[in-house]
């Protein structure tokens, strides 16, 4: 496995062993990334909820201003006429796209959050599978060990000469 020791028992069957500390570290990293995406999605939905509440307050303020202006223009004994029906319909039509937008944003925010988790785990699984099948850790370790030996040989001889002269 890419994160630890891997061994192929049978051809085509990969058995990997991961140390618990590395597994915990990896899972906590994936959990934190997912939590960050969840916070972003929740923040967006909160923003849209606040925007919807503010638009509702603005509409109720407009209605209050409209009724107060109508009542101040009419004599005190007369009943104020009902608000214009076309104005109310246009306000309702303005609210419909907002509510649809909020639902759409919440849906896609949750969808993005869950697809991120699933995609992350699938990619991690494929990475570990291919790393164990092609013995990537062993080849990387062999390469590093060979390079370290190449570097260490001259240093070893220099150290031996230095010790011999002293």
From Swiss-Prot:
GO cellular component: host cell cytoplasm
Disulfide pattern: none
Matching InterPro entries: Herpes_UL5
Keyword Protein biosynthesis recorded: no
Keywords assigned: Host cytoplasm, Host-virus interaction
Record's keyword annotation contains Transcription regulation: no
Subcellular location: Host cytoplasm
Subunit-structure text: Interacts with host IQGAP1.
Function: May play a role in rearrangement of cellular cytoskeleton towards an efficient viral assembly and spreading.
Protein name, per record: Protein UL5
Record lineage: Viruses, Duplodnaviria, Heunggongvirae, Peploviricota, Herviviricetes
Gene responsible for this protein: UL5
